[in-house]
Amino acid sequence: MAWSAPEARDFLQDIPLYERAGIIVRMVNLWKNPPPKLQVKVTADASGSETTVHSSGLSVRSLRKFSVSATLGGKDLTPEELGELLSNGDGLIRFKGEWVRVDARKVRDLMDRWNQAARMMSSLGIPLVQGLRMLVNGPSGQLVQIPEPDEDCVMEPGQNLRQTLDILAGKVPVSIPELPSRLDALMRPYQKEGFSFLYRITERGFGACLADDMGLGKTLQAIAWLDALRRKGRLEGLPALIVAPASLLSNWKEEAQRFAPELILRIMHPSSPDPWQPENTLRRKECHAVITTYAMAARTSALADLHFPAIILDEAQAIKNAGSARSRAIRSLHGERRIALSGTPVENNLNELWSLMEFLNPGLLGSRKSFESFTRSLERGYAPLRRLVRPFILRRMKTDPALVPDLPDKTEIPAYCSLTPEQAALYQTQIDMLHAVLDEPDPAARLMLILPILARLKQICNHPAQFQGTDDYAPERSGKFRRLQELCASIAARQEKTILFTQFRSIIPHLHDLLSGIFGRSGLTLHGGTPIPERQNIVTAFQKESGPPFCILSLKAAGTGLTLTQASHVIHVDRWWNPAVENQATDRAYRIGQHRNVLVHRLICRGTIEDRIDAMLKDKRRMADDLFSGGPEQWLMN
């Protein structure tokens, strides 16, 4: 029996009905494959007047060339072929000897709307960052209204735009300044790659995030980049601005003197004997770079009036809360080139990524509101977002043996504890209070009541005396202190060193008393009240092989920027709310320069809030791993 094309089309479309009715349908393999699909193709590009050619390649500023056409199975159609297809109706259509799938009405509508949008965009032009969002169906908030993302429409870059994207991806060789012999001899191959990445991206007019794992030498790579700008004459007017946590000011200055002695760096902070002053126009040019803290940068209004040749944010997760005064102030600074250094660009949620990218590449992720709406739609993974931001983020892990073949192993061990009867009774009292608070109808008021209870629960897990505000820190009153005694006795017996982290400054002296008795000698402590000049002395003392056997540190004050590789054990006395902070603290010991295997002990009281926090942290680690996973095949330009 022979069928006409319309009869065959009707049969193929009705196969699901036959199968639901229990009829077995057997087809040749050729018919089992999905038929080619008719799609609208929009090509975006820059005209010659919107491009710049210089030593590091082609740069695109905005997009003004848009064309709308049609493809069939990925192959371009002529206007005549498209007209023939659309005139044959909808569904499965026989075309050039094969079946194709056509939704004629939808294709006509898409082409009409895109042609209208293309004429407007060609007339007005759109910023490059908006064009990048369009290519991945990213966050909306476009300056020109365009049709919503649709599976029947594909976006492609034109020749000039593709060349720029290939340069961003590192696919096209560009001119990168040679490193001075001193840096060339010191830097590892992956660090030279990081320097090239920073230079390549920033010379295109984009901001770059170096998101290497902690301990891979982000500071060294940034110093190499700054020194290249100095040698190119880019720092002869105003100096570059570096913003970093207070604990890293002296570290930056020492690293610059060590690796790039011709790069003059000054400190803008009250702790400096001769601080740099932005108001002093005569002395602005006395250095190539000035470093200050986030707090100083946010409250020094004179900085907002200056146009720096370059801005570096170290530990850039400090601006993660987009709505905070600090984050807004830092994002308002003017910098011709911008880079961010952060081993943890996302700690809790994707909104933190928006804040970071809004500093580096304003507008890339759309408005904050449109980005929040966009991320809620990412139910099947982060591929669209990953493709959009990946060209501007370079992330390497020190666990990659190709990068650091001699780094020892790190083993993470949960150290479970039980509450003592006294702790359990205090804990239950707070749980009863929590249940009563949950009946509060006002969400804001309820939250303000819940947070203090959660803090008290964590204090009880540490020791009843911390909750009660007394000095009776007898170990037998706390299951966690007894577990800590056992753990540190084993470390002391092996004559090894350990560092301990806690979020509670008040408990540090009592932990020190406990451990001094176990190790038979005093240790070191470092917290937010430790003067900045004294912090380096503490690190130097601990790093001596004959130095103190332990160091107790406050998590927020000492979790970044310190090198404590003499420790082969890291103990987290209590748990913080995001894994990135804990990981950063751990990496004070587990970093380049560590030659011993590192054991990470996390004290967890069973059946308490600490169990819940542990599960939550595992979920957050999975989110960050998913967002930054994958290789170059997931970049925007592919």
Regions found by a protein language model. Name each.
Residues 230-324, 372-373, 479, 520-547, ...:
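SF2 helicase/translocase NTPase motor core
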Residues 213, 314-315, 573:
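Walker B catalytic acidic pair
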Residues 230, 402-423, 428, 441-562, ...:
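Conserved Helicase C-terminal RecA-like lobe
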Residues 291-297, 301-305, 328, 364-470, ...:
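Inter-lobe coupling linker of SF2 helicases/translocases
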Residues 1-164:
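Accessory nucleic-acid engagement/destabilization modules that flank
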Residues 196-204, 219-235, 329, 359-360:
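Walker A/P-loop NTP-binding motif
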Residues 320, 325-328, 333-370, 404-432, ...:
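SF2 helicase/translocase ATPase core recognition
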